[in-house]
Each structure stands twice: as structure tokens, then as C-alpha cells.
A protein has these predicted regions:
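GST-like domain detector, emphasizing the conserved glutathione-binding G-site
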Residues: 1-151
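Glycine-rich, flexible loop/turn motifs
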Residues: 39-42, 169, 227
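GST-like fold's C-terminal all-alpha helical module
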Residues: 104, 108-220
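Long hydrophobic alpha-helical segments typical of transmembrane helices together
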Residues: 210-240
Length: 240
């Protein structure tokens, strides 16, 4: 049986949300776990930009943006009225893709992602946009600038965290605090979750003591979900 091919990288947040959508829609695919240092030739042929996820359908159609893959999954599930294996109703996911939800995901994928990258890798940035790793001999100054940079971008990232916390308080966009997936699961949850997970992992002690209790509970619920665990199994690296 021929299956769609998904080129993926286990720890990539974009690939995570694509895998979650595929699993939720009960769409079987052949997962090809790539090496970032030696990307498969076929993947580069069908998607020269060289980033994951890349979904190659049986008819040769290529979908190489994670949000587009999520939307395609929803269309497939709706057309065949798939019986879902995992928590939630796909109708709830589909119903909540309105303008506000899309705007929330857009902020995640632009401003928040930039702050996340700088927070995770402060050595690549400084207060003035200078790469810190160009000053390897200035150890004390390097450490000081690195910490200042990390705190700066964490603070900027917190603007989005605070907004999500407020949404969880008010149940806006079904980004709810009930954690009942049948009622609260939506497009934004899956699209945003992998990035909040990464932000929290930079300094888990700080996050666990931060002033975002609703967001923290929401994150823990997703991390512990059978859906997430099912897409985080380790696959051998594809060679080809």
C-alpha cells in the first residue's frame, strides 16, 4: 500500500504540529526522519527550501508548510468523516479556524518565534544585534551580554505568554482552561503548543515558577497527552 511520505525531524516544532494533525486525523504516512546535516535528495528535489515538514502525497502533490499540512488534514478528515482515535472532536478543531485564531497563530509564528530563537540561543545575539560568538576571548563580557540578551528576549516573549494566559482565563478561541479536549481542542492549540514547550524548556525552573498558572497547566496537559506522546517516538534516520 502506497502511503504519503512525511519528511520530518522529531524535535522541530513545525514538524511536531504537522505530525499531531496527521495523527489526530488518523492519516497514515511513511515518516522519514531526516538528518539536518545530510538531507535526503528526494526531499530537496520536491522542496528545495530544505526545511521540514514536507508532505508528499501519493499523487505527487507536495505540501511543505506545516500549517498547510494541518489544514489539509482537516479537509481529509471532514471529507471522509474519520472516526478519531484520540481525544477531541475534529469538528471542534475545524470550527475554530476563524480570523482570531489565525491571528493568534500568526503572532506565534512571527514575533514570538523570533523571541524564542533569541532566548534559546542568546550567544547568537547581543543588545545591538552583534553575534556574541565573535568575541570568544572576552569571557566575562561575553557571559554578561549573553545573560542580558537572554533576559531581554524572554521578557519580550512573555508578552505572548501573558496574552495566552488571558485567553485561558476567558475561554477565547476555545483556548480553554477546562482541558476537556472534546470542548477545547482547536487549531491554535496544536499550532502553538510545540513553541510554548520549547520556550518553557529553556529555563524550566523559571517557567514552573512564573506567573502563568493557566498556561503552565495547559502545557503540562498537552505534554502528557497520548496524542503528543504518540508522535514523539524515535524513528531511525532515513538515508536516501
Amino acid at each position: 500500500m502506497n502511503l504519503p511520505i512525511l519528511y520530518s525531524y522529531r524535535r522541530c516544532p513545525y514538524a511536531m504540529r504537522a505530525r499531531m494533525a496527521l495523527k489526530l486525523a488518523d492519516i497514515a504516512v511513511e515518516i522519514r526522519e531526516i538528518s539536518l546535516r545530510e538531507k535526503p535528495k528526494h526531499m530537496l528535489q520536491v522542496s528545495p527550501k530544505g526545511t521540514v515538514p514536507v508532505l508528499v502525497l501519493v499523487d505527487g502533490t507536495v505540501i511543505d508548510e506545516s500549517l498547510a499540512i494541518m489544514l489539509w488534514c482537516m479537509e481529509q478528515a471532514a471529507s471522509k468523516q474519520t472516526t478519531l482515535k484520540y481525544e477531541g472532536e475534529y469538528a471542534a478543531l475545524q470550527a475554530n479556524i476563524h480570523a482570531g485564531c489565525r491571528a493568534l497563530v500568526l503572532v506565534n509564528d512571527t514575533d514570538f518565534k523570533k523571541n524564542l530563537d533569541a532566548y534559546k540561543y542568546p550567544e547568537r545575539y547581543s543588545q545591538h544585534g552583534i553575534q556574541l560568538d565573535l568575541q570568544p576571548n572576552l569571557h566575562l563580557e561575553h557571559a554578561k551580554l549573553k545573560l542580558q540578551t537572554q533576559l531581554k528576549y524572554r521578557t519580550q516573549g512573555e508578552v505572548f505568554l501573558a496574552h495566552l494566559e488571558s485567553l485561558l482565563q476567558t475561554n477565547t478561541y476555545s483556548f480553554a482552561n477546562t482541558f476537556n479536549f472534546a470542548n477545547s481542542l482547536n487549531f491554535a492549540d496544536i499550532a502553538i503548543f510545540p513553541f510554548i514547550r520549547q520556550f518553557a524548556m529553556v529555563d524550566s525552573a523559571w517557567f514552573e515558577n512564573s506567573n502563568y498558572p493557566k498556561l503552565r497547566a495547559w502545557l503540562h496537559n498537552w505534554v502528557d497527552s497520548s496524542l503528543f506522546k504518540s508522535v514523539m517516538t524515535k524513528d531511525p534516520t532515513f538515508v536516501g
